[in-house]
C-alpha cells in the first residue's frame, strides 16, 4: 500500500505569541467568562505528538478549531523555531481550513453584536447610543453603512486584556516591508 499524504496550511508563529494567545483564551474562558463556551484541550489530551494545544470555538452547528503545534521543521528565518498554528472550520463530517481574517469574522459574527437595530433609531432621535463592540479584530474590512455611522458616534472602549484574535496570532511582524522616507524626511539624502 502506498503512502497517503495530507497537506495542511500551518502558519509559522513564534513561541511567545502562542503563549500570549493561550493565556488570553484561558483568561476569557475562566475569568471574564466571555468565552466560557470555548473548549481548551491540552497537549496531553491529544494523541498527536506535535499538537501543543487545541481551542474549540462553537459557532452554532459548526465549530472553529485553532490547533497550535510544536516540534515542526524549522523555517528559513531565525525565529521560525518549529511552532505553528492551523485554523479549521468543522461541521459534522465536513472540514475546511480558513485564514485568520475569516476566522476572526466568524467569531465576531457569532459572539459579538456591535449595534442593535434600535441603536440606529436612538441615534437619529439624538439619544445616547451605548452598545460597543468588544471584538475589534473581527472588523478587518470596511463595515456596513450602519456600522460606519455608529462608530463615528461612539469610539470603542479598549478592553484589557484584549479578546484573543486569530489574525493577531499568525500576523507576520518580521517580514513587513520597510517604510522608506521621502526626500524631505531623509537626513542622508539632503546632507544634514
Curated annotation (Swiss-Prot):
Q: Quick check: keyword Nucleotide-binding in the entry?
A: no
Q: Which GO terms describe its biological process?
A: viral life cycle
Q: Where is this region: Multimerization?
A: 151-164
Indicate which residues form the motif BC-box-like motif: 144-153
Region feature Interaction with host APOBEC3G, mapped onto this chain: 40-44
In this chain, composition skew of type Basic and acidic residues spans: 169-192
User: Which residues does the annotated region (Membrane association) include?
Assistant: 171-172
Query: Where is the motif HCCH motif annotated in this sequence?
Result: 108-139
Task: Give a short account of its post-translational modification.
Answer: Processed in virion by the viral protease. Highly phosphorylated on serine and threonine residues.
Write out the ranges of the annotated region (SOCS box-like): 151-180
Give the multimer and partner information: Homomultimer; in vitro and presumably in vivo. Interacts with viral RNA and Pr55Gag precursor; these interactions mediate Vif incorporation into the virion. Interacts with the viral reverse transcriptase. Forms cullin-5-RING E3 ubiquitin-protein ligase complex (ECS complex) by interacting with host CUL5, RBX2, elongin BC complex (ELOB and ELOC) and CBFB/CBF-beta. Within the ECS complex, Vif interacts directly with host CUL5, ELOC and APOBEC (APOBEC3F and APOBEC3G) substrates.
The entry assigns this protein to a family as follows:
Belongs to the primate lentivirus group Vif protein family.
What is the name of the protein in this document? Virion infectivity factor
Q: Which organism is it from?
A: Human immunodeficiency virus type 1 group M subtype J (isolate SE9173) (HIV-1)
Amino acid at each position: 500500500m502506498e503512502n497517503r499524504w495530507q497537506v495542511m496550511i500551518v502558519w509559522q508563529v513564534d513561541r511567545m505569541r502562542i503563549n500570549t494567545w493561550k493565556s488570553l483564551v484561558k483568561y476569557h474562558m475562566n475569568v471574564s467568562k466571555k468565552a466560557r463556551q470555548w473548549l481548551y484541550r491540552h497537549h496531553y489530551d491529544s494523541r498527536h505528538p506535535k499538537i501543543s494545544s487545541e481551542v474549540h470555538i462553537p459557532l452554532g452547528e459548526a465549530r472553529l478549531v485553532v490547533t497550535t503545534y510544536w516540534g515542526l521543521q524549522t523555517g528559513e528565518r531565525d525565529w521560525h523555531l518549529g511552532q505553528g498554528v492551523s485554523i479549521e472550520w468543522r461541521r459534522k463530517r465536513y472540514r475546511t481550513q480558513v485564514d485568520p481574517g475569516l476566522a476572526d469574522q466568524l467569531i465576531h459574527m457569532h459572539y459579538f453584536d456591535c449595534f442593535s437595530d434600535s441603536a440606529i433609531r436612538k441615534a437619529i432621535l439624538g439619544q445616547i447610543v451605548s452598545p460597543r463592540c468588544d471584538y475589534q479584530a473581527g472588523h478587518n474590512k470596511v463595515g456596513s453603512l450602519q456600522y460606519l455611522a455608529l462608530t463615528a458616534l461612539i469610539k470603542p472602549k479598549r478592553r484589557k486584556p484584549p479578546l484573543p484574535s486569530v489574525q493577531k496570532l499568525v500576523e507576520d511582524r518580521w517580514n513587513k516591508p520597510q517604510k522608506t522616507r521621502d526626500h524631505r524626511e531623509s537626513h542622508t539624502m539632503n546632507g544634514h
